[in-house]
Each structure stands twice: as structure tokens, then as C-alpha cells.
Amino acid sequence: MPKLKTRRAAAKRFRTTGSGKFVRRKANKNHLLEHKGSDRKNRLSHKALVDPRDVERVSLMLPYA
């Protein structure tokens, strides 16, 4: 059977934790940051787990993760 291809766009956006969960970056921290408070920007800096409803889709895009 041939190798499965990884979706490169997904590979750049998601990482796997040691326990097999997927981690993502939060949105709204790229530009237009002047009016956002420092507390909010700090909160957006932290990583977030992928929602359980999306895990199956992400794992199909990353067959070797």
C-alpha cells in the first residue's frame, strides 16, 4: 500500500503532545494589536487543545502524527 500524504497546511498549524492530543495556536494575535489589552494578548499567546469534535478531522490530515 502506498504511503499516505500529509496535508502540509495542517502540519504547519498543529503539533502532537506526548499523550497524543493535538495543540493549536489561538487566533487574533497576528496584527491590529494596538487596541487589544495586554491581558488579552497574553491569553492569546498560550496554546490551546483542538476541540474533541475536530480531532478526527485533524488526525486524518496528519496520518503520521
Curated annotation (Swiss-Prot):
Domain of life: Bacteria
A cellular component annotation (GO) from this entry: cytosolic large ribosomal subunit
An annotated Gene Ontology molecular function: structural constituent of ribosome
Record key words, sorted: Ribonucleoprotein, Ribosomal protein
Pfam families, sorted: Ribosomal_L35p
An individual GO BP term: translation
Disulfide pattern: none
InterPro entries reported for this sequence: Ribosomal_bL35, Ribosomal_bL35-like, Ribosomal_bL35_CS, Ribosomal_bL35_sf
HAMAP family according to UniProt: Ribosomal_bL35
Similarity-based family: Belongs to the bacterial ribosomal protein bL35 family.
Name of protein: Large ribosomal subunit protein bL35
Species this protein is from: Thermosynechococcus vestitus (strain NIES-2133 / IAM M-273 / BP-1)
Record lineage: Bacteria, Bacillati, Cyanobacteriota, Cyanophyceae, Acaryochloridales
Gene from which this protein is expressed: rpmI
